[in-house]
Amino acid sequence: MANDPRNFPQRKLLVTCALPYANGSIHLGHMLEHIQADIWVRYQRLRGNIVNFICADDAHGTPIMLKAQQMGMSPEEMIAAVSIEHQKDFAGFDISFDNYHSTHSDENRELASHIYLQLKKNGFISSRTISQLFDPEKEMFLPDRFVKGTCPKCKSEDQYGDNCDACGETYSPTELINPKSAVSGATPVMKDSEHFFFDLPQFESMLKEWTRSGSLQTETANKMQEWFESGLQQWDISRDAPYFGFEIPGEKDKFFYVWLDAPIGYMGSFKNLCDKRDDLDFDEYWNKDSKTELYHFIGKDIVYFHSLFWPAMLDGSGFRKPNNVFVHGYVTVNGAKMSKSKGTFVKASTYLEHLDPECLRYYYAAKLNSRIDDLDLNLEDFTQRVNADVVNKIVNLASRNAGFIAKRFEGKLAENFVEPELYNEFVAAADRIAELYEAREFGRAIRELTALADKANQYVDEKAPWVVAKQEGKDQELQEICSVGINLFRVLMTYLKPVMPALAARTEAFLNEELTWEGVAQPLTAHEITAFKALFNRIDPKNIEAMIEASKEDAAAEMAAKEKAEASNAAQETELSKDPIAEEIEFDDFAKVDLRIAKIVSCESVPKADKLLKFQLDIGGEMRQVFSGIKAAYNPEDLVGKYTVVVANLKPRKMKFGMSEGMILAAGPGGKDLWILEPHEGAQPGMRVM
């Protein structure tokens, strides 16, 4: 075998998946990336390489802060619960992480601060006052993802404030056309704030050289070239309080933008792993001159951050850059975007309740390649392909031979292997399949494997052991035929081991032999296997239907819970909580205010004044002219003849439209929501309000 790992030096790899955001459940879209990365990692381990496979929850940002408030818990409590759920889902799909951590950790805080201070020391951080979108209703600066509007470049509507899903462009939220707050729906206003910036343009030549290295996917390199031609911009790395994240060292009420500390979470998770193990050295993997290999698996929606900002941050702070960033497309279901109403937005946990995770691992592998293509999970094709390939072609190869070995030969394979040429053809395929695994061309590797399975089954069909078993004096021939079939199955399962580790483990128990890449070089002879048990079950379409229905129920329950939480929060948000009581005053201060009952004698709109009404008030033998900003709440004619309360001893104020000689009392937040105070029947003009 030319690709025998014993012929190559052992590689040391650090592999990561993009960090799932800690405000929701893992779904089948997430699983594409994690399955893709896990297959590659398992292949590398199978070849004898040292792999550290890490991930973490991305646990910072305004969305997490707001959702925690909605759920009535602290952000720390929420992200802890989400982390448990995420790790359970990944374990259910046999994702073989060496460590799973959180960006809200001591390791990440220390590393984020260190990298920032190094960048600042090296002249890559600057600050300036910017005009930023501010929600006037919620009284908070709006993070990028909480502003929506029309993309300034391609004009696609309903796009987030940091980047466009349609064209991939990144921009400032202030550049959006017709922006709206995603928190309240209000039109944001501009407000000044000091922000801190990472000087990305200083790294343009380095990034261009990195792009020309030839290792990046063609689509990624082409996209980066577009960004270079458009001109790199300084990157805003700060956010204002209130914000859930890490405070910027030396600054008050200023926090790191989530996209600064999120990729540093790769380092934080690895640092956490190093602290648990004596055989790992953090610096060996992250020093600028590291000889180890670093790979990131990500989705196409976050290429900009990983191919520009991240390598520039690392380079500017004295750390190594990734060897490569492997980008994949999105998952669609039945040719369309995943839909909660149709039940095709399937959570990982819902899938695991109804179907074998190995089925999805196989199907994704069968359709994955090294390009940035979207992958369609066609549920009918999913059923047919898994049943046809895994059950009918591969597992059936074992079942149709194992019975004869167990019953007629006490589980022992033949001493002589009678089909060396056929077996060598299977062994020779190892080099080609290895190249395809290494290149992440999993679909092509699966096609090579199933083509071999067809040849193996053709051999069994031609030799017909069920016929030979009925012929006297043919025991040795029967044993030899079935032993060939079992050995070909062993080779196939070795090649399939990175894709279907649970099936491979059951196969190893059946064969009484570990499946190793170098082990396929020689067939098993005179070897005892165990009694055959069903290794894999067919997909029942009814289980898929049940999964879809359960997903619809999940979506409905999620919506109901959200509405309940919103209603609860609305009920808790009292007028007093929205507008707290002012600072205490002494009684003598209050006694200075002279409140009197007044009768509205006349009321009219003030020309060229949007908010004002002009009143003539009788306060008990004396007439007063008063202007009041309640025009949006009342028609002037409706107020004539009513009684109200007025501050009678307020110093007259000269206004553009005349002198105002008092103040009418009204309650409410403003605008249309204002109500003048009216006394009970019996109160007369001039009476003092006690």
UniProtKB/Swiss-Prot annotation:
One of its GO terms (biological process) is methionyl-tRNA aminoacylation. Zn(2+) binds at C151, C154, C164, C167. Disulfide bonds: none annotated. The keyword Nucleotide-binding applies. Belongs to the class-I aminoacyl-tRNA synthetase family. MetG type 1 subfamily. Homodimer. This is Methionine--tRNA ligase. The lineage of its organism: Bacteria, Pseudomonadati, Pseudomonadota, Gammaproteobacteria, Vibrionales.
